[in-house]
Amino acid sequence: MRYGDTHKAETHAKLVRLAGRVLREKGPQNLTVAALMQAAGLTHGGFYAHFKSKDALLVEALESVFEESGQTLHSVTDGLPPRHALARYIDVYMAPAHRDNPSAGCPIVALNSELPRQSRKFRTAFDVGVKLLLGKLAGWIKAAGSTEGEALAASVLSAMAGAVAVSRAISDKRLSNELLGAARASIKARLGLSEVVL
């Protein structure tokens, strides 16, 4: 069967997308080439027509999930003034929907404990993604009137990711929701956003 000119690129993108979901949901150690290719409806041997190695796939999938996170960030904050954008992003990031859907959530929360066991290229791609998000948060924080944009952004991102990670680990949904709500309110109060109405 002859495929169209775009078939290889479409298949490649599909593999990266599937790998990104598995990466966030189960971690890099549980992403196997055989299972990925089967999920894509392809043969195991076809993998190497798209990637040099599993590590190359992992790096590309990680870059893709950070790009997806950036698109989500943009979609929920587009057109809002900085204070409102920051408040909106905190609300979305620290919502039960984010906690309950790790395969589509922030890669920082899903992967931070995995990094020490990953390749240098993977860790570098993670660093790049984190720095881009920190830059966006710092920009909003500065535009909202703070003089400590970068330091505050680092602290806020760490608190948000930590709260979501802990809330995912708690099996008691009521307690998990309380933790998320308290952390969200605390972070917004710290940023002077408690009164921002969206």
Question: Predicted segment positions?
Answer:
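Hydrophobic alpha-helical connector segments
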Residues: 60, 74-105, 153-156
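Helix-turn-helix
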Residues: 14, 18-56, 60
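Helix-loop "lid/cap" segments that line or gate small-molecule binding pockets
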Residues: 95-98, 107-117
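Hydrophobic/aromatic-rich alpha-helical bundle segments in the mid-to-C-terminal region
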Residues: 119-128, 132, 141-198
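N-terminal intrinsically disordered/low-complexity leader segments
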Residues: 1-10, 193-198
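Short, structured helix-loop boundary elements
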Residues: 12-13, 33, 55, 59, ...
